[in-house]
Amino acid sequence: MSNRPRLKPLAFFLLHALAGAALAAPGAPDAPDAPAAADTPLRETAAAPVDTVFVQGQVRQVQNVTRRDLALVPPGTSPLKTLEKLPGVSFQSADALGAYEWSSHISIRGFNQNQLGFTLDGVPLGDMSYRNSNGLHISRAISSENVGSVTVSQGAGALGTASTSNLGGTVAFTTRGPANEAGVTVAQTVGSDNTYRTFARYDTGQLATGTKAYLSATRQRADKWKGDGPQSQDQLNAKIEQRLGANTLSAFFNYSTRDETDYQDLSFDAVRRLGFGFDNYAPDWNRAVNAAKGVYSGGVNNMDDAYYLGRGLRNDWLGGVAFEWNPLDNVRLATTVYGHRNHGESHWYTPYTPSSSAVPISVRAQEYGISRGGVTSDLTWELGEHTLNAGVWRENSAHSWTRSFYAVSGPESTDRFLDNPFSNPIAQRFGTTTTQFYLQDTVSALQGRLKLNYGFKNTHVTIGGANLVGGRAGGRLDADKNFLPQAGLTYALSSQDELFTSWARNMKAYQPGADGPFSQTQKAFDLSAANIRPETSSTVDIGVRARHGNYQGSIALYNADFKDRQLNVATCTGIVGCPTTLTNIGRVRTRGVEAAIDSKLASDWSWFNSFTFNDSSYRDAPVYFEGATPVDVNGRRVVDAPRVLFNTEVSWEHAGWFARVDAKYTGQRYYTYLNDSPVPSYWLSNLSAGYHLGSIGPFKGTTLQLNVTNLANKRYFGTVGTNGFVSADPSGTFATMLAGAPRQAFLSLNAKL
């Protein structure tokens, strides 16, 4: 199962090639990392230029995934998954498209998903975790066909990023704006496990009034690759833009309804007994009932090996109005007012709470609600050699969650929002107010060869929590930092080579909801509230970018010092959902090197490689206790943080034909803080190939594409930590992993009218 690569020769070649290389003519001021929304087609038919991955002129490590990359993956693939080619980025999922939210996890330089920041056209998405309390996942925020580009800052994002969780990097998604030309785009995908996806988009084109708009609809249906149950989603996206002289007024609206059936979480012990293909019992109701009574069959030996069924339901509404005002040639003010509502439920058929004396199973539902609204405003003022940026972000968010139990009499369908529970053991409600301000200056010197960027932000987050029912915590927590500085510079060593370095301090606000400090008992919360401190990080990058003819690349060294790391230690199985133990384990130290090179080998061929070595470990950690057992994690590697990542991909395009083969290596990971249960490393490869058919009857720009994922049909653990992390698991019985999808194939046809 574990295939260790021989990376040393390749890594040496890569680093040697990059040491004398890197891109850099003097760039634009160090503005927010996301590029402006672009009028880009669904598919770029020409080979992308080699300079689309590495972002020039930035004082930090910033890289870009273009529409071309997004178009080469199967339609419906999470934009997050396309980032796994970049250095420092680890993405994992149990499904081929990376869209199954329970399993979709991303980490960057050892910082996990809830320590990163995410935005869509500048609108905050929160930390995009499964039980998100202040945002939503990108797969629900926008159809993947409407994403124009994704920009990653691996170290520390721009000061203006609207996020209170970006201890590590930031990910900025930029949508495809309304097209200048009128037309209808249609795309149809069919594939493995009865997958079909239909996408249609209408663009008005630019009207005589200066107005342009688009409206798109998406429907996706598929079965799970193992077990029983559907994976379904419907989406509507719309945007309108109005030119007002030199200014632009726009409005957007996005709606998503999602129904995904869960895969069963696995342990090492379960896989040894039952195999990677084992899943929940559905549609075998009698087997689930017998297991709930302690009568096991087929290798099952405990109640938590499987349940009858699990499901996640999510409905989201995201909309807003944006105004870009350009009162002078050197002054720009961009303001966005947004609102977001979410209604969600997660269902688990639990054998721990019976519906009646005759039925030993009930549906345990966790019900989520989010209602938030906010405003972001960013000012840019160019004054000679200086570019001043200032901005403010303000958000008010209401979040609630409850745990309820619903009676069932048999295997009836529960693919809907339920009502009339027989028990409500837990209910919490939270109100969160966020205010963030930033100010920075970017100065250009030495005829533009040197660019110095410096500034700060202050962040104030107040959470008021009320425990309405049950044994969880209520109270108030404030996370305040008046001065979080950031500084960096770029220096053009030549017209082709650029040195960059940056330093930044960041803070992560406390998390309301079912995770974080409020997931403790009230007694534990009261004991910790006076001493708890928000997590903070200090990050340093230094690197070089180069561009020499058909080659471009970057190499960076980094160090991150992460203080007051809060661990939520699971104390029981996920379906029982006990209060967690919150432990401050002191400090996490991260050091590493990451490199990437993009080569245009010939007019038809290109080759991209990236390599990461990341060492993240716990430091200065006080010993904590689980019962009477002391736990010392000092020197242990951070959970779910692979030390080695490597990606390679070869692309070819000629006379309308195109193909790409990629392979990704993910190193060993851990799900225990004491590192006693390593998860094996693995290789994963994929293929994309197709032909640009051109015009066929009324259709133009027609493209036929085949995608094959997991080419070698590897068996591997795709996701680690679905049910959290534990101190130790020497017997391998803690079920917190998901098997990765086997080989799957998808065929897509898209065209424009």
Can you annotate each of these PLM segments?
Residues 322-326, 332-338, 344-348, 492, ...:
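Membrane-embedded beta-barrel scaffold of Gram-negative outer-membrane proteins
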Residues 241, 248-320, 347-362, 411-418, ...:
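Acidic/polar loop-and-plug regions of large Gram-negative outer-membrane beta-barrel proteins
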Residues 29-32, 385, 389, 446-447, ...:
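Gram-negative outer-membrane beta-barrel transporters
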Residues 131-136, 145-149, 154, 158-238, ...:
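Outer-membrane beta-barrel translocator/receptor signature
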Residues 40-181, 542:
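Acidic, small-polar-rich N-terminal luminal/periplasmic segments of exported/outer-membrane proteins
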Residues 310-347, 358-468, 474, 492, ...:
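Face-selective signature of the C-terminal outer-membrane beta-barrel domain
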Residues 6, 13, 490, 501, ...:
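Conserved C-terminal beta-signal and adjacent last beta-strands/turns
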Residues 1-86, 203, 319, 329, ...:
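N-terminal Sec signal peptide and the immediately downstream disordered periplasmic leader
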